[in-house]
Amino acid sequence: MGRGPSIENRKNASDAKRGKIFTKIIREIGVAARGGGGDPNNNPRLRVAMDKGLTANMSKDVIERAIKKATGELEGVEYEEIRYEGYAPGGVAVIVDCLTDNRVRTVADVRHAFSKCGGNMGTEGSVSFMFKRVGVLHFAAGADEDAISEAAIEAGADDIVVYPEDGAIDVLTAADSYHAVKEAMAAAGRTPDHAELTFRADNDIKVEGDTVLQVKKLLDMLEDLDDVQDVYSNADLGADAYA
């Protein structure tokens, strides 16, 4: 009898989260199409954004409308890209990539998050030198390590990371060879469960004690901001932070 509202509330929360994800991907598709044209075959960044949309179960019609708005075939809002950098508690480096139609609002929101959670914003370039742009092809637990490793080497991947706790595998590539490696592995029958271009820290910082919750609070707060697309850090929070 008492379960109805609980189930409905969970569904509403799930729908809201899905809507926020869609909004961010649509912005990303728009910026990519406006900057490099609406043909994904000639616009690698657009191809990445479209793949992200399809992975999130976004319909092709929604993706097509986002592209048309960006290329001027349909009326739409223009967004600009902004990157903020700073430090979380414990000296953890943080990069915040945003797409916004109101720079003043966005910087105020990001600054508030850093301040509220005990961090501080830095200047441009203050932490980004600690990260590299890489492609990541993720294979979930249970994947065939030997077969994936062989396919990755043949495809020209840079590195292979196997997670001992569950056997999941990340195949790492240089940013400029991401698409080629992904397509070569798919042709070899090794399609990843998830793939993306991202930033990875050169060295992680082990975070312990009460600082774990402080850092996680900041990262979560930044992720929840409407104008924020991606948040990267060099924090190693440990498995308990996500339990």
Curated annotation (Swiss-Prot):
GO terms for biological process: regulation of DNA-templated transcription. InterPro entries: Integrase-like_N (IPR017856), TACO1_YebC-like_2nd/3rd_dom (IPR048300), TACO1_YebC_N (IPR049083), Transcrip_reg_TACO1-like (IPR002876), Transcrip_reg_TACO1-like_dom3 (IPR026564), YebC-like (IPR029072). The keyword Cell inner membrane does not apply. The keyword DNA-binding applies. GO terms for molecular function: DNA binding. It holds the Pfam family Transcrip_reg. It is found in: Cytoplasm. One of its GO terms (cellular component) is cytosol. Keywords: Cytoplasm, DNA-binding, Transcription, Transcription regulation. Gene3D superfamilies: 1.10.10.200, 3.30.70.980. Belongs to the TACO1 family. This is Probable transcriptional regulatory protein Smal_3128.
